[in-house]
């Protein structure tokens, strides 16, 4: 597909570009960047004057629920939600039914995405067979099938020797290991952050130590094995400190956090709102500050949504039995832009966190507008104001703690391989 994007502020940290430029895409790839570009007659054009033009945003942690849990979300609806949020690529986690632990399931997702998805869908395979934490999955086969990482997300690999072997094997074949880091014994029957609010509400708490101890284990295993590891959805002061210190001594560790962890505290649980129930849980104001500081100083490498759709029947129940997770694809960008408005990040940092870095971590040929690169582009209006309404969310599920919130900033065009797959109304 051919497309000319004219006059926008192009921000591409992969090339050190921050300038008003045109972007010309031909046959689905970036052909030229420059001022006053001419396109062949009949080429569609976007007037991006006053808008921000970036490499397509990448969410490296989503749950598309397909196969087996399509009543919550499927590849078609999840990709529509991604496109509406400005994401041109998503990596989908393997805790489906059946789980993504075989070439057949990975191939199913890739083939279905080719026919139904508006955006690029990259599967993440399981670390262990069946996601049971007992023996390693066939990582080589998963990589051959198109998986860009492995994870038992939803729960940790509890056996340290097994995790060590996973890191060593993954290093050998060049695939990213993504750790869901928590100590399940400490989590116990906890349903929210352990602290004043949990005590006041009479709910069992999950201590910050459950995350910190598990993150520390992964760091030491990666250091011992000389292998890279990526830590999913960090949320605590301690886990940020552990990763920061590990990076300083050369450990190959990367990590992500999610917008809810730098926006909401456990105060959001008051009223027993199950849309504020997630794993890891919402933490304290000090933890929010740690996430913002970690994003600013490079400790945290990526912003990922952990988009986790659930049917109303799984959320409209008592807090203790409600399932964990929220939808986040359509609210991630404005919540992240707020960090720019607050002066905690600049736009170049934000684009790195939401596009360039996720591409590097997963080894994707995305996250750049270099000539010859895939023509995936996000066009953003940072001043556009809108309200989060359940009826207007593209996701099949509506379990968001941000319903009713007034947002500022959103993607107005999402372009995949030169084709506009989303345009804001």
UniProtKB/Swiss-Prot annotation:
GO BP: any one term: purine nucleobase catabolic process
Cofactor note: Binds 2 Zn(2+) ions per subunit.
MF-aspect GO terms: allantoinase activity; dihydroorotase activity; zinc ion binding
Residues reported in the UniProt entry to bind Zn(2+) 1: 61, 63, 153, 306
Requisite cofactors: Zn(2+)
Pathway where this protein functions: Pyrimidine metabolism; UMP biosynthesis via de novo pathway; (S)-dihydroorotate from bicarbonate: step 3/3
Gene3D superfamilies on file: Metal-dependent hydrolases (3.20.20.140), Urease, subunit C, domain 1 (2.30.40.10)
CDD domains: DHOase_IIa (cd01317)
Keywords tagged on the record: Hydrolase, Metal-binding, Pyrimidine biosynthesis, Zinc
InterPro entries tied to this protein: Amidohydro-rel, DHOase, DHOase/Allantoinase_Hydrolase, Dihydroorotase_CS, Metal-dep_hydrolase_composite, Metal_Hydrolase
Matches recorded under Pfam families: Amidohydro_1
Residues engaged in binding substrate: 63-65, 95, 279, 310
Enzyme class: hydrolase
Residues making up the signal peptide according to the UniProt record: none
Active site: 306
SUPFAM superfamilies (UniProt xref): Composite domain of metallo-dependent hydrolases, Metallo-dependent hydrolases
GO cellular component, one term: cytoplasm
E.C. code: 3.5.2.3
Entry's family note: Belongs to the metallo-dependent hydrolases superfamily. DHOase family. Class I DHOase subfamily.
Function: Catalyzes the reversible cyclization of carbamoyl aspartate to dihydroorotate.
Listed HAMAP family: PyrC_classI_B (MF_00220_B)
Designated name of the protein: Dihydroorotase
Natural source organism: Geobacter sp. (strain M21)
Origin organism lineage: Bacteria, Pseudomonadati, Thermodesulfobacteriota, Desulfuromonadia, Geobacterales
Gene name linked to the record: pyrC
